[in-house]
Design a protein with these regions (language model features):
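Short beta-strand-loop/turn "lid" adjacent to the catalytic site in phosphate-handling enzymes
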Residues: 69-97
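Phosphate-interacting basic helix/loop segments used at nucleotide- and nucleic-acid interfaces
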Residues: 134, 190-193
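Gly/Thr-rich phosphate-binding beta-strand-loop-beta motif of the actin/hexokinase/Hsp70
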Residues: 2-29, 132-161
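Short glycine-rich, Thr/Ser-proximal phosphate-binding strand/loop in the N-terminal lobe
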Residues: 14-53, 155-189
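Short acidic, glycine/serine/threonine-rich loops at helix termini
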Residues: 92-94, 120-122, 151-154
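Conserved phosphate-binding catalytic cores of ATP/NTP-utilizing and phosphoryl-transfer enzymes
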Residues: 2, 112-138
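A glycine-rich helix N-cap at a beta->alpha junction
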Residues: 104-110
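Short, well-ordered amphipathic alpha-helical segments that serve as non-catalytic structural scaffolds
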Residues: 57-69, 192-193
Length: 193
């Protein structure tokens, strides 16, 4: 029976994480290890639009540690993605170059649409209840380091989606206003505190 070991690395706003999976036709996808370290790229990107050399150094050290862990499992198949913290940094090309030079890794920066697609796809694959959940009116709220994504489903169909950039003045009152301004959302949401 062929078994593939795959590593998925996420360079996020707050932390950089690696999940190692065992994949086989017989047993499907099974997570065998999860490793994460705080890097806080978003702290700099969202306040200065720039990632410092100190943070780049920390990121490279984390990724080199992940590389050692991948050697333990003899992993050759992997993907490294980054989201808004790297996407919105004005020096993201320098960061990508430094990572490539110092770790050998190529990072793919996902667009917001790609990020949300993968998030919802993973929910659909992982949770048996996902399809029954979106059968009725459902609001999915994806809170990230750089933004909040609201996605409204009804009868298993995506009706509306809205991305809200996080700012220092952002509050959940903003979500309420967006919901109230969208008749389809307003009919289907129960407000709770």
């Amino acid at each position: 029976m062929a078994v593939t070991i795959f590593a998925a690395i996420d360079v996020g706003s707050h932390e950089t994480s690696m999940r190692i999976y065992e994949i086989s036709k017989k047993y499907g996808v099974h997570e065998i290890e999860y490793v994460h370290h705080t890097a806080r790229l978003g702290l700099e990107t969202y306040s200065t639009k720039h990632i410092s050399y100190t943070t780049i150094d920390k990121l490279c050290n984390i990724l080199n540690g992940f590389s050692e862990k991948m050697k333990e499992y003899d992993i050759h198949d992997y993907m490294i993605i980054a989201t808004s913290a790297l996407r919105e940094a004005d020096n993201n090309l320098i960061v990508l170059d430094q990572v490539k030079q110092r770790t050998g890794f190529l990072i793919k920066i996902l667009s917001n649409s790609e990020q949300r697609y993968l998030c919802y796809k993973s929910l659909a694959l992982k949770e048996n209840s996902f399809h029954s959940l979106i059968k009725d009116g459902t609001l999915l709220v994806d809170v990230g380091g750089g933004s909040i994504q609201l996605s409204l489903y009804d009868k298993k169909t995506l009706i509306a989606t809205q991305n809200i950039k996080s700012t220092k003045t952002f509050s959940f009152i903003s979500i309420g206003r967006i919901v109230e301004d969208n008749p389809k959302m307003n009919k289907r949401i129960i407000y709770t505190v």
